[in-house]
C-alpha cells in the first residue's frame, strides 16, 4: 500500500466521531492491507514498533522540526516550524501546512528512501527501522537526513501523518480496543480469540496476520514466548471486607515498595523487563545472577525488585529507580544500592503456559522452582479471617513494606487488566499518576527553572488537565526536572510552556473536586509532587475515568 493511501484513510478515520464508524474504517483498512497488515496495525495506533519492543526512534521534537524545515526550503528554520506549532497547536497540521514534496531534498534520497516513486508503507517502515538503528557520533544529523528525505517525498496529507507517527502523536481515535475489534471483524474471528492472542503475544500486527491467514484455530496456537514480555496484571484499591465478601477467602501477599519486573529465563540466560516492557537486564546484574543460578528450566515470572540496605531492610522506591536508570558504571551503582528480587507469580514454567491457571496453582508452581528456604519467591497466605489478614498487614508495615495485596486465589492471570481480582490495600492516601503537559518558568533568581507543572490524565482522544503542582518539589529536583523537560518543550509564550506528553508524575492530593477551570471537569485540591514515575509512560498514566471513579467514591 502506498503511504498516501494510508494517510487518506487515517484522515477519514480522524473525521469520524462514532466508535462504530471508526472500527468499520479500520476494518476496511485491514482488509485492503495485503502484505502491509502487520505494519498498518501498528501505524494506525501511532506505533512504529510492537509494544513489547523497547526500541524507539529516539527522535525529539526539535529534530523533527529540523527535518520539516529542511524539506520546506531554505527560507524556513526549525524555529519557524516551532512558531507555527504554537499557532496551529498540532505537529501534523504544521507539517501539512508546508509544501514539502519536490524541494531540494529530492536529490538526497540516499539517506531517506529511494527515488521519486511514491512512498510505500513497507518502505517507510524500513526507513524508520533504519533510523532507529542509527547510533553513535553524528547520529542526530543522520536521523534528520533520513527524516528530511522522507518528508521531501510526502504530500501535505502524508507529511502530517508522518510527523505524527514519528513523534508518537497519531491520535486519530484508534486504540488497542479498536484494532482488536477491527481485526476480528475483518477476518471473521471471535473478538475473544483476538484478545487472548494479543494478551500472550503483545503484538497486534502478528495477531492480525494470524487471524487473516489461519483463522480462529491459528489464534489458539499463539502462546507466550520467552524474551517477549507481556503487559502486567494490575490491581485496584480495595478493602479486606470487600475481598472476603467477593471471594470468601483471599490470597494475601506483602506489597513491596519496589519496581515491577518480568523475568524471562530460557534455561540458560535471564532477561528482565520493566512494567513498560523496557529491557532492564543490564542495570540489575544481581537479579540476573540469582535467576540464572537458581532456576533449572525455562520460566516467565512476575515480581518486584526492591532496594535494600546492608541489613536487608527495604529502602525507598526512588533508590530502586536509581538502579533502573543506570546505564553506565553499573558495578559502582551496585555497590551503592543493592537490590533483591521478590517473585510473586509464575506465568510459564518448563514449557507450560500458566495464564489460565488459578493463582493458587501458579504460586505452587512458583514455589516449586526455588529451594524451600529461598527468599526469592514471595510468601502467600490464604485466609478467610479479617483479623488474621489485618495482622498480616501490620507485619508487612512493620517490615517497612507498603502494605498488602489481596488476590482472588481462583483467578487467572489477565495481562494488562486492572480488575477486581487483585486489590491493593495501603494505609496511604490514594495517588494519581498524571502526565505533565505544561509548565511555567519561575521568577527572579529561578527565572531559568521550571517551577510549576500542568497535570493531565488520559482521555479517549488525548489528555485533559486536572490541575497544577508546585508543592513538594525541592530546588534540586526543580533543576533536574528542568533539564529533563527541555527536549520536550513544544512552545513557549512568556512564562507559559507547552510540553509534549512524555513524563509521568505521581501526585498526592487531599480531594478531587468538580471544576470548570480544567478540561477534565475536575481539579485536585492541594496537589503535591511525590515522584517521577520512571516505570510509566503517558499511555499507562491514570485516565479520566479513574478520576471520575475516585471523585464519586470520596
Curated annotation (Swiss-Prot):
It catalyses: ATP + (deoxyribonucleotide)n-3'-hydroxyl + 5'-phospho-(deoxyribonucleotide)m = (deoxyribonucleotide)n+m + AMP + diphosphate. CDD domains: Adenylation_DNA_ligase_Arch_LigB (cd07901), OBF_DNA_ligase_Arch_LigB (cd07972). It comes from the Archaea. The keyword Glycosyltransferase does not apply. Keywords: ATP-binding, Cell cycle, Cell division, DNA damage, DNA recombination, DNA repair, DNA replication, Ligase, Magnesium, Metal-binding, Nucleotide-binding. It holds the Pfam family DNA_ligase_A_M. InterPro entries: ATP-dep_DNA_ligase, DNA_ligae_ATP-dep_bac/arc, DNA_ligase_ATP-dep, DNA_ligase_ATP-dep_C, DNA_ligase_ATP-dep_cent, DNA_ligase_ATP-dep_CS, DNA_ligase_ATP-dep_N, DNA_ligase_N_sf. Its EC number is 6.5.1.1. Its cofactor is Mg(2+). GO terms for biological process: cell division; DNA biosynthetic process; DNA recombination; DNA repair; lagging strand elongation. ATP binds at residues 253, 260, 275, 304, 344, 418, 424. DNA ligase that seals nicks in double-stranded DNA during DNA replication, DNA recombination and DNA repair. Belongs to the ATP-dependent DNA ligase family. HAMAP family: DNA_ligase. PANTHER family: DNA LIGASE, DNA LIGASE 1/3 FAMILY MEMBER. This is DNA ligase. It comes from Haloarcula marismortui (strain ATCC 43049 / DSM 3752 / JCM 8966 / VKM B-1809) (Halobacterium marismortui). The gene is lig.
Amino acid at each position: 500500500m502506498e503511504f498516501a493511501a494510508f494517510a487518506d484513510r487515517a484522515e477519514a478515520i480522524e473525521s469520524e466521531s462514532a466508535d462504530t464508524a471508526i472500527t468499520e474504517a479500520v476494518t476496511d483498512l485491514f482488509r485492503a492491507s495485503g502484505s502491509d497488515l502487520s505494519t498498518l496495525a501498528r501505524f494506525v495506533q501511532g506505533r512504529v514498533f510492537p509494544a513489547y519492543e523497547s526500541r524507539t526512534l529516539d527522535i525529539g521534537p526539535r529534530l523533527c522540526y529540523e527535518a520539516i524545515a529542511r524539506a520546506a526550503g531554505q527560507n524556513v528554520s526549525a524555529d519557524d516550524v516551532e512558531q507555527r506549532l504554537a499557532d496551529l497547536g498540532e505537529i501534523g497540521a504544521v507539517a501539512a501546512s508546508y509544501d514539502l514534496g519536490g524541494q531540494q531534498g529530492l536529490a538526497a534520497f540516499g539517506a531517506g528512501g529511494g527515488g521519486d516513486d511514491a512512498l510505500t508503507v513497507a518502505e517507510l517502515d524500513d526507513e524508520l527501522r533504519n533510523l532507529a538503528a542509527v547510533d553513535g557520533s553524528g547520529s542526530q544529523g543522520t536521523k534528520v537526513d533520513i527524516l528530511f528525505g522522507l518528508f521531501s517525498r510526502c504530500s501535505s496529507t502524508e507529511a502530517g501523518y508522518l510527523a505524527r507517527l514519528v513523534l508518537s502523536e497519531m491520535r486519530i481515535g484508534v486504540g488497542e480496543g479498536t484494532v482488536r475489534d477491527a481485526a476480528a471483524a475483518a477476518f471473521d474471528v471471535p473478538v475473544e480469540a483476538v484478545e487472548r492472542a494479543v494478551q500472550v503475544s503483545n503484538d497486534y500486527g502478528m495477531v492480525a496476520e494470524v487471524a487473516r491467514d489461519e483463522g480462529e484455530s491459528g489464534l489458539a496456537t499463539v502462546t507466550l514466548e520467552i524474551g517477549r514480555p507481556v503487559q502486567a496484571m494490575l490491581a485496584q484499591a480495595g478493602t479486606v471486607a470487600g475481598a472476603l465478601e467477593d471471594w470468601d477467602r483471599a490470597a494475601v501477599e506483602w506489597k513491596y515498595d519496589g519496581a515491577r519486573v518480568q523475568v524471562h529465563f530460557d534455561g540458560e540466560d535471564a532477561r528482565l523487563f520493566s512494567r513498560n516492557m523496557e529491557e532492564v537486564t543490564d542495570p540489575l546484574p544481581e537479579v540476573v545472577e540469582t535467576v540464572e543460578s537458581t532456576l533449572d528450566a525455562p520460566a516467565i515470572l512476575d515480581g518486584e525488585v526492591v532496594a535494600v540496605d546492608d541489613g536487608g531492610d527495604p529502602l525507598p522506591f526512588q533508590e530502586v529507580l536509581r538502579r533502573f536508570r543506570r546505564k553506565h558504571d553499573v558495578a559502582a551503582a551496585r555497590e551503592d544500592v543493592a537490590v533483591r528480587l521478590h517473585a510473586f507469580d509464575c506465568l510459564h514454567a518448563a514449557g507450560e503456559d500458566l495464564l489460565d491457571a488459578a493463582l493458587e496453582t501458579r504460586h505452587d508452581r512458583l514455589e516449586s522452582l526455588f529451594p524451600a528456604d529461598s527468599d526469592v519467591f514471595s510468601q502467600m497466605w490464604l485466609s478467610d479471617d479479617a483479623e488474621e489478614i489485618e495482622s498480616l498487614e501490620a507485619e508487612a508495615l512493620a517490615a517497612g513494606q507498603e502494605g498488602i495485596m489481596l488476590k482472588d486465589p481462583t483467578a487467572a492471570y489477565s495481562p494488562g487488566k486492572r480488575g477486581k481480582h487483585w486489590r491493593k490495600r495501603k494505609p496511604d492516601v490514594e495517588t494519581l499518576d498524571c502526565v505533565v503537559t505544561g509548565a511555567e518558568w519561575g521568577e527572579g533568581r529561578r527565572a531559568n527553572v521550571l517551577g510549576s507543572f500542568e497535570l493531565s490524565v488520559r482521555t479517549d482522544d488525548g489528555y485533559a488537565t486536572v490541575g497544577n503542582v508546585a508543592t513538594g518539589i525541592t530546588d534540586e529536583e526543580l533543576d533536574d526536572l528542568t533539564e529533563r523537560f527541555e527536549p520536550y518543550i513544544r512552545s513557549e509564550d512568556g512564562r507559559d510552556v507547552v510540553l509534549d506528553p512524555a513524563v509521568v508524575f505521581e501526585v498526592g492530593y487531599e480531594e478531587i473536586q468538580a471544576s470548570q477551570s480544567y478540561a477534565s471537569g475536575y481539579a485536585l485540591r492541594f496537589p503535591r509532587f511525590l515522584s517521577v514515575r520512571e516505570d510509566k509512560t503517558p499511555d499507562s498514566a491514570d485516565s479520566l475515568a479513574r478520576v471520575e471513579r475516585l471523585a464519586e467514591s470520596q
